[in-house]
Structure formats: structure tokens, C-alpha cells
């Protein structure tokens, strides 16, 4: 029996059939030229992705089948951590069996998730690594279909690219056929302008660089390029030098994102020769990812809005308050309004039936007379058995109005006639809340004597004791705690009265509440204690009393920040000193890994750096991605901060996770004085990071002649190769910066010879 012709052409490439997989094939992606199914292998119990070409029927032409097989064979040979693995071909149906990527394509993720900056940068960097690998193959393998749909993400959101096989299509198609086919495949936006302008030129590596730039734009903005434009409009715009809008680019983005935008612009340059190669791109994306990962997130100070009733007083001296007047004016009975306004002047205060009715806004004569402060007239009206607890449309009872207006006689009169001391308005405020807000201990005592709930909580959970603590009314607070008010009740965000008193720095209230059993370390929802709030606001006396009373100086909030972290980040020298005296830890890390010294270095607080150093803080403490305080200072701080840390004993040669030393960062940032300072403290000029770059490589890449001269004088060698055999000399030549070129020509006569041999030729594809 003759062998299957397909098998004859497969060589060592494994062949699968539908029977090798379980019956349930799940469609996970579909495009104009292919469908991707998820299927489980029967024996291996492993999930695979099977990319089928619905345009190729079972009796497809042998050339089409051969193309698919050739493509699979080519892809299977390529082994790299950021390129999807190929396991073989499927005969029935015809397709390629490949590694299953749990999170699907970047295209799908961008449309359904908001990605953090760190993840966006990592995807950009890993994509550049994959493309650099393809371009470094001999001969270079061009992708020619780089787009979010072909950037796949595994279960940990790491990148693997697929579908780098369009070169055959291009060889077999006319330019117009290729463009039309690209439009159908949804990749027109990723085609560079030279493809529209130069009819005979074959695509080169810079084609992929342009496509990569559009991918960067999509990742940064999470939008679709050229949305709303038809095929011809896109071609015309791109050919004319126009690109996706930069309007979404925001000044609020981190500085590293602004630098990524600069890289993106260079990658989509109209002139292919001016676009960087992927080797250079990986250098920049690695730098930017490393810098972004070291960013310090200091929790923002959240102002505590002063709690007040949302209602204005219904009575103003000598006249009817505007609110109550407006409610009366809004009534649908103008005649009644006139009668009601005359009540205070009438000797006969017995109202007619129509005057006792409730109107649209539910304001009654009793509300009006209470707002007027007319005790005797209210007494006469109450004698006619009116509803003493009648409520306006906003829930106001006469007693609430009297309490808000600080009318103790009216409150007593209304309570004597059975007014409910716990009836609340629409915001949940009881009369006792108003008395506490006003510091009216007389009315508060009267209300409590008539059954007012001492721990009544309004809609957002505030009690009268919270309000007394906020407004520094010790008289009311003492009355409330004498009536067993609970000092540990939490409002909606978790604040106790002690949180409120500490935030506003009301020392007398802090002392009173702590003496009455308030929990010193009670936590809000964000886990902040009263001490956190007092430190954040700089309330020294409140801090002092809390610490004396036994508050824990190292309590951590939801970001892992203790009071000392906050004080160090905000430059509160005296508070730092006080916290250290009460035993605050110098080495507690936040969730990002930052110690108080990291934060002081990041913010540039020199006094606090010296204080922490004198207190024996670890100058080499490792934070996020193993950055020391000196790394943060070299990257973000002023030269004086770098100098202070070095004087205090910081190690100038500490290497972070990717091998970057403070000298690398100072060179990358072009801070000349920091470079000098680090070298004077014996920074290693030959230090190499994980990809083999020395500080001299970075100086050459940045085109900074002054710093490169200093490094050379300190012994830097210009012929040291990095991980891809590139020297600072070669980077300098490729940067084409005149100052660097002039310096090198004078410093190193052999540069001309090196230039003649095209030092970057093996990388510049």
C-alpha cells in the first residue's frame, strides 16, 4: 500500500489526526484565513492549539499543503522562550499543532482588560526580544505579520509570537494582491509606507520594526489604530507620513512611558534607514522596563472631608431661612403661604383645617414656627394636638430644626409633647448629631435624658462622638462618654472617633478618648491607625500622646507603610526622630520592598537620610528588584542625595536584579556630578549588567561625550563586548553623535579601521 504523500514530505515532523485528540474542540480564535481550536490529546492529557486553514479543503492543491508543511517545519526548528512552540501538523483537518497559550492573543486582552504599565512594558520588551531573535538567524527570518493578534500570552502573561510566514506569500503575490490580502487579514495598519510607495523593493527587517511601533502604540493607548478609516484612507495617510494619533498620550503617564513614545516614533520613521534595528530596540526596552519596575508608589494622602450636615440652618436671625422659605414658596397653595407667614403676627393661632394639611413639600406651620424660634406660638400650636413629629420632604422634624438651630427651649417643649428624640432626616442625622456638631452640650444632655441613642449612626456611620471629635468639642465628648458612648465604633471607611481626633490634631480629644478605652491601633479599611493619620498630617502633639499611650509605631497599612515610612517620605524630621525614640523599625519593608531610607532617598530628604544613617539603618537594604537606596537616588534624586548616601557608607557597586549598579543609572540619566561622585567612591567602571553592558556602553548609547570621557579617564575600555558582542565603540558609531565620533577619533586611531569593517554588520540586518 502506498504511503500517504503528505507523510512522505513530513520527514521528522510529527503527524496528528482528529482521532489523536478528544472530541470537544473549542474554537478560541478566528480570522479571515485561519481558525484556532483548543483540543486535548487523548494519551498525553495535554492541551494544544490547532491552527486550521478553512480556506484549504481536504483536497487542497499540493502546493498549498506543501506550503503549510514547509511553514510548520520552519517554525518547529525555531526554539526560543518568546516564540510559540510547534509540535507537528494535523492531517485531518489540515492545520498546525502548536503550544496552547492560556491567555490567548494580545489583541483579545487589550480589548477586555486594562493593563498596568509594568505589564505593558514587559510585553513590549519580550516582543522585541522575540523579533531580535528572528532577525539574528542566518539568514534573517522576517515576520511580516507582527500585530497583537500574533502576539500570544501564556498563563503568566509572558509573550510568545507566532505566524511568521508571510515571506512566501509576498514572493508569490503582486504588490496589490499582497495589500488586499493584508487588508482582509486585518494587518493593513501595520504595513510600512515604503510598501505603498516603492513598487519593486522587497521588504527588509525594518518592515517588522515599523509594525512593532504600531504594536507599541496599541499597548500604550489600548486603542485601535486608524479606527474609522477605510483601506484607501489608511494607505494615503501612511504614505504621506501620518501615523496613529498621539492625542491619547498623557502628561500624567510615567516618564518611562514618555521615553517609550520616543522609541515608538523612531521605529515608525518614514525613512526605513532611520528606524533602529531590533538589537538596539531590546537595549532600550530593557532599560525602560528596569526603570519602570523600580518606581516608588507612595500612597497618596487622602484628605478627610470635614463632616457637616448637608442642610443649612432653617432659621437665620431676624428672617426666615432661605431653605424653609423656598420650601414654602414651592408649595402649590399661594394663599396658604400668605396665611402661614401671618401666623406669627396673629393673635388667634388656632389654624383652620386647611392650614393644618400637609403640602407637597410637607412643610407645616409647626416647622415654620419652630424655624422662627417662636416658643409661645409653638406652645399654642402644640395645644391643638398637631403631629409633633411631622417631617418635611427631606425628613426634617420640628425637633431636628430646633436642635440644628440650637434652640434648647424649643427642644424641651417639643420633647415634653412627645417628640421622638431618635427620628432622623433623609441622611440619617438624629437631633443628637446636630447637638454634637454644634458643641451644644445642653441640648445634647436634654436629648439623652429623653431617650436619644448615644451611638446613633447616620448614613455614613458617623456617631455624635465622631462629630464632637472632629470639631474639638470636649464638653460634648465628655457628656457622651459619661453616657456610655462607644469610642470604638467605626464609620463606613473604618474610622473611629480617635482616628478623627488624631487626623485633626485635637490633643484634648485624643487624651479623652484614649482614657476612655479607645483602641490605640484601631484600623480603617485601608488598615491605617490613628497614628498613621496623625503622622500624615504632621500633628506632633497628637503623635506624642499616642506613642506615650502605647500605640504600635510599626503598624502597617494596606500598602505595607508604617508611620516611619510615611514620615520619611514626607520629610517630617522631628516626627521621624520621635518614632525612632519609641522603637520604630528602620528595616521594615513596604509591599514594594522599600524601607524608610529608600523613601527618604527617593524623595531627596537629606536631613532624614543622615538621621536614619546615624540610627544605623541598613544602607544596602534591598527593595523592589533589589534596588538599594543609592539606586533610587542615582535614578530619581539630585546629586546631593547621591553624595549624602555615599558619605553615609552606601555601596557604590551594589547590583540590582538585572545587574545595574548606581553608576549605570547615573550614566543613563546623564547626571554628570553623580557619575563623578560615584567614581570618587570607587564605583566599578567595568561593572556589567545581565546583558553585558558597562557604563561606557550606556554613555555611548546616550551620546554623552562628557560622561564617556570621564569613564575612559577612570579606566573604562571601549572594546569590551556585551552579550551580543557589541562594544561601546560600535554603539557610538551607530549612534552617529558628532561629539562622540570626534572624541573617539581623537582617542582611538583604530576606530577608523573598526568602522571600515562595519562593526555592527552582523546585527544590522
UniProtKB/Swiss-Prot annotation:
Gene Ontology CC entries for this record: cell projection; cytoplasm; nucleus
Coiled-coil boundaries: none
GO biological process: cellular response to retinoic acid; regulation of cell cycle process
Residue positions of the active site: 145 (proton acceptor)
EC number in record: 2.7.11.1
Family matches, as SUPFAM superfamilies: Ankyrin repeat, Protein kinase-like (PK-like)
Listed name of the protein: Ankyrin repeat and protein kinase domain-containing protein 1
Organism expressing this protein natively: Homo sapiens (Human)
Gene name of this polypeptide: ANKK1
Amino acid at each position: 500500500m502506498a504511503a500517504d504523500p503528505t507523510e512522505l514530505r513530513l520527514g521528522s515532523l510529527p503527524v496528528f489526526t482528529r482521532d489523536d485528540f478528544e472530541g470537544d474542540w473549542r474554537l478560541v480564535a478566528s480570522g479571515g484565513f485561519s481558525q484556532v481550536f483548543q483540543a486535548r490529546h487523548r494519551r498525553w492529557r495535554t492541551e494544544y492549539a490547532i491552527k486550521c486553514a478553512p480556506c484549504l479543503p481536504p483536497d487542497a492543491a499540493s502546493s498549498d499543503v506543501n506550503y503549510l508543511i514547509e511553514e510548520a517545519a520552519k517554525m518547529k526548528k525555531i526554539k526560543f522562550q518568546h516564540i510559540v512552540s510547534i509540535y507537528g501538523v494535523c492531517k485531518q483537518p489540515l492545520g498546525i499543532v502548536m503550544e496552547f497559550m492560556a491567555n490567548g492573543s494580545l489583541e483579545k486582552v487589550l480589548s477586555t482588560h486594562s493593563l498596568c504599565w509594568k505589564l505593558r512594558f514587559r510585553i513590549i520588551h519580550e516582543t522585541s526580544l522575540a523579533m531580535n531573535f528572528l532577525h539574528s538567524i542566518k539568514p534573517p527570518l522576517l515576520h511580516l505579520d507582527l500585530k497583537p493578534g500574533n502576539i500570544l500570552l501564556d498563563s503568566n502573561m509572558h509573550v510568545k509570537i507566532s505566524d511568521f510566514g508571510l515571506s512566501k506569500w509576498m514572493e508569490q503575490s503582486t504588490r496589490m494582491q499582497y495589500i488586499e490580502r493584508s487588508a482582509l487579514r486585518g494587518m493593513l495598519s501595520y504595513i510600512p509606507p515604503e510598501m505603498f510607495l516603492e513598487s519593486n523593493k522587497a521588504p527588509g527587517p525594518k518592515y517588522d520594526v515599523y509594525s512593532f511601533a504600531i504594536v507599541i502604540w496599541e499597548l500604550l493607548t489600548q486603542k485601535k489604530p486608524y479606527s474609522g478609516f477605510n483601506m484607501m484612507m489608511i494607505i494615503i495617510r501612511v504614505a504621506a507620513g501620518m501615523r496613529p494619533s498621539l492625542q491619547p498620550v498623557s502628561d500624567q503617564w510615567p516618564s518611562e512611558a514618555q521615553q517609550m513614545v520616543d522609541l515608538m516614533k523612531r521605529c515608525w520613521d518614514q525613512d526605513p534607514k532611520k528606524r533602529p534595528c531590533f538589537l538596539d530596540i531590546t537595549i532600550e526596552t530593557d532599560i525602560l522596563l528596569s526603570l519602570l519596575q523600580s518606581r516608588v508608589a507612595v500612597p497618596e494622602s487622602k484628605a478627610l472631608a470635614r463632616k457637616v450636615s448637608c442642610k443649612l440652618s432653617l432659621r437665620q436671625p431676624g428672617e426666615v431661612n432661605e431653605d424653609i422659605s423656598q420650601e414654602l414658596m414651592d408649595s402649590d397653595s399661594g394663599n396658604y403661604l400668605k396665611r402661614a407667614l401671618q401666623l406669627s403676627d396673629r393673635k388667634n393661632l388656632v389654624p383652620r383645617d386647611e392650614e393644618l394639611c400637609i403640602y407637597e413639600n410637607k412643610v407645616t406651620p409647626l416647622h415654620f414656627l419652630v424655624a422662627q424660634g417662636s416658643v409661645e406660638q409653638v406652645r399654642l400650636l402644640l395645644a391643638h394636638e398637631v403631629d409633633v413629629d411631622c417631617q418635611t420632604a427631606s425628613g426634617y422634624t420640628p425637633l431636628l430644626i430646633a436642635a440644628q438651630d440650637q434652640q434648647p427651649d424649643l427642644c424641651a417643649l417639643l420633647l415634653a409633647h412627645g417628640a421622638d428624640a431618635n427620628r432622623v432626616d433623609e441622611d440619617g442625622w438624629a437631633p443628637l448629631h446636630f447637638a454634637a456638631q454644634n458643641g451644644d452640650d445642653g441640648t445634647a444632655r436634654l436629648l439623652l435624658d429623653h431617650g436619644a441613642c448615644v451611638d446613633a449612626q447616620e448614613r455614613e456611620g458617623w456617631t455624635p462622638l465622631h462629630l464632637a471629635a472632629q470639631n474639638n468639642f470636649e464638653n460634648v465628648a465628655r457628656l457622651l462618654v459619661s453616657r456610655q458612648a462607644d469610642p470604638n465604633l467605626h464609620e463606613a471607611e473604618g474610622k473611629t472617633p480617635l482616628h478623627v481626633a488624631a487626623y485633626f490634631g485635637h490633643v484634648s480629644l485624643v487624651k479623652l478618648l484614649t482614657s476612655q478605652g479607645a483602641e490605640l491601633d484601631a484600623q480603617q479599611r485601608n488598615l491605617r491607625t490613628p497614628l498613621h493619620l496623625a503622622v500624615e498630617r504632621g500633628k506632633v502633639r497628637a503623635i506624642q500622646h499616642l506613642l506615650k499611650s502605647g500605640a504600635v509605631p510599626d503598624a502597617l497599612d494596606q500598602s505595607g507603610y508604617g508611620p516611619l515610612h510615611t514620615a520619611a517620605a514626607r520629610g517630617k524630621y522631628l516626627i521621624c526622630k520621635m518614632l525612632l525614640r519609641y522603637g520604630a523599625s528602620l528595616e521594615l519593608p513596604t509591599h514594594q520592598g522599600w524601607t524608610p531610607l529608600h523613601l527618604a532617598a527617593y524623595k531627596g530628604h537629606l536631613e532624614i537620610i543622615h538621621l536614619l544613617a546615624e540610627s544605623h539603618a541598613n544602607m544596602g537594604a534591598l527593595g523592589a528588584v533589589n534596588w538599594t537606596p543609592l539606586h533610587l537616588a542615582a535614578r530619581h534624586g539630585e546629586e546631593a542625595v547621591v553624595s549624602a548616601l555615599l558619605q553615609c557608607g552606601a555601596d557604590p557597586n551594589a547590583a540590582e536584579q538585572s545587574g545595574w549598579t548606581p553608576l549605570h543609572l547615573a550614566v543613563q540619566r546623564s547626571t554628570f556630578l553623580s557619575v563623578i561622585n560615584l567614581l570618587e567612591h570607587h564605583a566599578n567602571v567595568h561593572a556589567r549588567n545581565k546583558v553585558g553592558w558597562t557604563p561606557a556602553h550606556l554613555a555611548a548609547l546616550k551620546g554623552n561625550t562628557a560622561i564617556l570621557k570621564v569613564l575612559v579617564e577612570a579606566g573604562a575600555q571601549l572594546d569590551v563586548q556585551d552579550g551580543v558582542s557589541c562594544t561601546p565603540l560600535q554603539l557610538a558609531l551607530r549612534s552617529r553623535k558628532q561629539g562622540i565620533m570626534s572624541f573617539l577619533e581623537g582617542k582611538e586611531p583604530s576606530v577608523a579601521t573598526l568602522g571600515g569593517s562595519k562593526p555592527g554588520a552582523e546585527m544590522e540586518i
